[in-house]
C-alpha cells in the first residue's frame, strides 16, 4: 500500500458537493478592521521612514505651528508608542481602556528677527519628547477595549469626494423641465454647487448659500467677459462680400437641420442645396468633397447672432458694442458705419449649442473682478463691509488654501476620471481649470451630451474604516490644541521654555476618548456568538456623523444596486427602519487604498480562463464583460458555449465568448459571511434568506456545540477568523495541556529573540457582552505534533474547529393537535432531558462601597436585622462564596451605609462611645439577586483603592492569581532549560575540554556520560579547544541569561500590578464584582429558528412517549407545521431535511460496520463505504491512504451522521440528494411512515422526516417575563415607569380605556386611572386599607391632572378648581388648589 497518512480527529471531515474550484484565497474576514487601524498607527514602521498617511499625516498637517509674530516655531519630528500599561485581559477585568502612551518628539525653534531688515536667523533649537495622551490599541480580534467593554468601530459608507452631475428629475419647476446641477464635494471644506435655473441661467452656490451668477465666480477667478465667452464658445467670421456676407462652411454644425433658404456657394454663386431640404451627414460629406469652402449670407442671417469680441474704435478707445451683445437691426448699422467689414460671432445655434453662459453674462450685474469678489464676500459674510484684501483672502481660503480645503487623493482621482483631466493626486485644492471644466461639462449636459452620475453606484460611494475615522477625529483634537499652543507661544517668554511647557495634550486625548466612548459608529460589540462578532466587524453603515439619517434616506439609497455584486451583500441587512442603510461586506470583497470596495475576478487571456486574480472597484469593472463563476468551461479553460451570460455596465446580457474579459472567482462572492452559511440559499426566497442571515447572529452558544450535518464549507473559516477557535501560531509539540492553557514547544520559526514556547491561555466561563458564556476547550493532548494554523482549542459555538451555532434535530413536518399552529414549535421532552438546547448565561453584578458625607460605606458580614440563614453563603468578608447556589433575594455582597440622624447629646455620645452600639446608625444596602434569576456563583473579583486595607477575600484572590503567574513562569522556564541544555550538550559532545567543573580532568573528550555526571547548572563551566564552537556556546549562554531575566522581569511586573491597588472612580473605596452563571434549559416561550428564516416559538414540550415515532421506534424531536413552507417559499429547509436524513442514515450504516469491525470483522468494507461517501469529489479526503486507526477515528466521528458541505449557488442538486438517500439505503421520497405516540396507530399519510439544524435564539422567555408589584414612579407624572429594566408596569393605553368604557366597567376604570397609577395620596390610603383588611378605597385627583393644570398656567391661563357642592349655608367652598 502507498504511504499511509494519519487522521488526528481534530477537524471535521465533510463531503464536498461544490463543483467549481476555488481559485482565489478568501481574505481574512476581519482584515477590514485590522489593516485600516495598522495603517493609521504604523507601529511597526521605523520612525524616520513612515509614509505620509495615518497619524503621521495628521501631525504633518497641523505642525509646524508658528506664533503670531513668527519669532518661534514648533516642529514635529516623529512619534512612538510605549508598551501598554495593562494587557487586554487586565483591562477587561479592571474596566480600563487598552491603550498605549503616545510620545511625540517636538522641536522648538526660536528665531532672532533683525528689526531693520526683518531677516530671520536661528537663535535656539530645543528637542523634547512630549506625552500626548493614550492611543487605544486594537486587540488581535479587531476590537477595542474601552472602559473594560469590547467595542467595534463600524466602517461608514459615505459619498466619495469629487464632482457629481445630476438633475432634479423635473421636480423643481411646474413645467417638468430638467434642471441640471453639478456639485464639487471636497473631503473637507466648502461645497461648490453650479446649477441651472428654469430660465436657463447658470448659477453658483457656495456652501448652499444664496446663489450668484456663475460668471461672477469666473470673474472672481480673474477672467473678463470676452475671455469667458472665448472659453465656452468657438467663433465664426462673417466677412463683407459686396452687398452680402461670406461665412465659412461648417458641416458639423449643420448636421440634421433643414435649410430655410437656398444655400449658395460664396465663390461660384451657384445654389448647392435648395431650400427645405434636410442636411444629412452624407450630403454634407459630398459638399465637402466637392470643395465647398464658404456660403453666401445676408444681413438677415446675421441677426440673432452674438458678437464674439468687443467692437472698439482703437484710435479713440470708444467701445461701440461689447462681446456677447446681440446683432439686430439697430446694432448692425452701428458696426458697419464704424467701418468694420469682418464680424466675429459666437457659434450658438440654440440647437446643439445653447447660449446659457452668454445669457448669464448679460444678466450678471458684476462688471469686473472687484465687484464679483465683493458679491461673493457679501454672500459668505452678510453684514460685513468688504474690502479688496479681505474679499480676496476669503475667496482664496474657500477653495485654494490647502489648510481649509482638501479634495483628498480620492477626490482628485475621481475628478480626473470624470473631467478627463490629468492632474497628480498630490494637488488637493481646486484649480481654475477644474472649475471651468465642471461648468463646461454641465453646459454640455444641458445641450444633451453625456450622462448624469448615479450617486448610488459604488464607484461614487466609499468606505471610511476605523483608521480614517480615527484620523479625522485626532485631527480635530490637534487643531483645538493648536489654538492654545499659538496663544501660549505668544504670551510667555519663549527663550526659557521647553516644548513640554507649550503643550496641553488634553484636547487631543479628549477627542480620542469622545470618539471611542460616544461616537455613533463606536458600538458595543455584538458578542452573542462568533458569527455575530465577525458580522459586526464587517458591517458598513450609511448612518453616523457626515452620513445619512434614517428619516431623510429615500428608497434609492437603500435599494440593491448592480454594483453591489461581489462587494456588498444583497441579502443581509436589518429589517425595520435601517433596512438598506446598514449593509454587510461580501465574502471576497476588500477595501482599496482609496476606500472603494473591490471584488476579485479571474482574468481571461486569449479566450481561456486563467488562475490570475485581479481586484477591481465598481468604476473599473464597468469597462469589462464579466462572466459568472458557474459558466461551463472546457478542460483547457475556454467557454463551452458560443454565447455566455455576463454582466456589463450594470446590465446582464448574453455576449459572444470572445468579448468576455473576466470571470467571477466563486459563486459565494456575492453574499456576506452569514448568508454564505445557509445551505441551499439558492432555493430560498430572498426575504426569508434575510431573516435567516440575521437570526444566525442571534443563536445562543449551547452547552454542547454540534456542527451541522448539512453545512456550506464556510464553517471552519468563520470559527478561525473570529478568534473563537484557537489556531496554532507556529508548529511544535504539545508539552502540557489543562483546561485553562495549552503549552506548545515550538519546532519552527525559532527566533533567538523570541521565546521557544507558546503558551495559549484559554478563556473559561467568561461573560460576553450579551451575557452569553465564552468558554474554550483544548482539543489536543500531550505529545501531539502541531502544524502552524491547526485548531488546538474549540471556543463558544465551535465544534472541532467548525462553527456550530445550534444542534441537529430530528424533525417531522406535520400538524400535531394544533400545537404547531402559526409557526409554533412542538418539542420532545428528550431535548430537555439530554440538555440538547441548554445554554449557560453569565450575569455580572457589581457593588461599590463609596465614601459618603456621613462616613464610608462598608462591605461586611455584619448587617443589621438580617437572619443568620440569609448570611449562609457569605464568607467573613461579607462576599458570597464561589459555587454558592443563589436565588432571587439572596445576598451576594453585604454592605452597610451610614444614615443621617438627629444630633446627639454629649451623654448619648459618651454612652455610644463606651458601648459601641452600631446598629442604629447604619442601614442595609446589600446587593441582592434580582427577581427571576437563579444560578451559581462562578467568579468573584475584589478591587481596592490604593492605600485601602485589603480584606481576607481580596488577599486570597491575589494569592491565587500570583500562583497562576508563577506556574506560567516556571513552565516556560522549564521548557527553556530543556531546550537550551539539549542544545548545549549537542555543542559540547565530541569536543576536548580544556577546563571544567571542580574535579574534572583536563583534556578529556566530552560525551553524554561524562557530561551527565555533573548537575546541569555546572555544564557552562566546560571550556573547549575549538574557539568557534566556544564562541557559539558563550552566545547561547548570553541569550539564555537574557531570556531568563526577561521571564523573571515579566513575572515581577505582573505581580506588582496584581498587588498594587486599583484605579477607582472618585469616591469609591472598594468594588466587588460577582459573576453568576445561569443554566437555561429550553422551555415554552423560547424562540427557535432554522437557517432559512423559519422561526417560531416553542409552544409545548411533550413527553417522549407521546411524540410520533418511526418504524424502528425512534421518536422525533421536533414537529414543525408544513403550512409554514409554501407561502414563505423557503424550500431550502425541505432540501436540508432530506439531505440531513441521508447523512444520518449514512452515519448509521457506518456505525454498524464499525461495530462489526470491532467485533472482529474485516476493515475493508468500512474503508470502502467511507471512501465512497467522503473520498469522492474535487475536495475529497485521501481515504485510500489512511491507516486503519485513522479509518476508525473517522468512522467514530461520522457515526452520528456524515457531515457534508453544499456551498451556496454551487451546492447539491435534487439528483445529489436522491443519490445520497439511495447510498444510505433510504426511500428517495425522503418520507417515512410515522406512528402516533399516544395511540400507536400509523398516520394516514407518509410524513417528511429528517434532520434540520435548529438554533436557539437569544430571545428567551426568562428574560422577557416580568411582573410588577410596587416599584419606582416617574418624577413628574408620578405614573409607574415602564419596562423590565426599570421594574415598570404595563401601560393601560387609550384603546384599553375604550374597552373598559364599552363594558361599562366604571369602577375598574376609575381604579386603573387613579389609585393604580398616579393618585399619590390615594395609593398610600389603599395600601393602608389593605393592611387593615378593608377593601374599599376613595379615588383622589391624579397627579397628571395637576401637571396639566400647571402647564395651562404656564401658558398664562388662570385655572382653578371650585367645589360646586353647596353646603348647608349655601356658599360654594373652594377646593384645595389642585396644583399645590
From Swiss-Prot:
It comes from Rhizobium meliloti (strain 1021). DNA-dependent RNA polymerase catalyzes the transcription of DNA into RNA using the four ribonucleoside triphosphates as substrates. It catalyses: RNA(n) + a ribonucleoside 5'-triphosphate = RNA(n+1) + diphosphate. Gene3D superfamilies: 2.40.50.100, 2.40.50.150, 3.90.1100.10, DNA-directed RNA polymerase, beta subunit, external 1 domain, DNA-directed RNA polymerase, subunit 2, domain 6, RNA polymerase alpha subunit dimerisation domain, RNA polymerase Rpb2, domain 2. Keywords: DNA-directed RNA polymerase, Nucleotidyltransferase, Transcription, Transferase. The RNAP catalytic core consists of 2 alpha, 1 beta, 1 beta' and 1 omega subunit. When a sigma factor is associated with the core the holoenzyme is formed, which can initiate transcription. This is DNA-directed RNA polymerase subunit beta. SUPFAM superfamilies: beta and beta-prime subunits of DNA dependent RNA-polymerase. Belongs to the RNA polymerase beta chain family. Pfam families: RNA_pol_Rpb2_1 (PF04563), RNA_pol_Rpb2_2 (PF04561), RNA_pol_Rpb2_3 (PF04565), RNA_pol_Rpb2_45 (PF10385), RNA_pol_Rpb2_6 (PF00562), RNA_pol_Rpb2_7 (PF04560). CDD domains: RNA_pol_B_RPB2. The gene is rpoB. NCBIfam families: PRK00405.1 (NF001616), rpoB (TIGR02013).
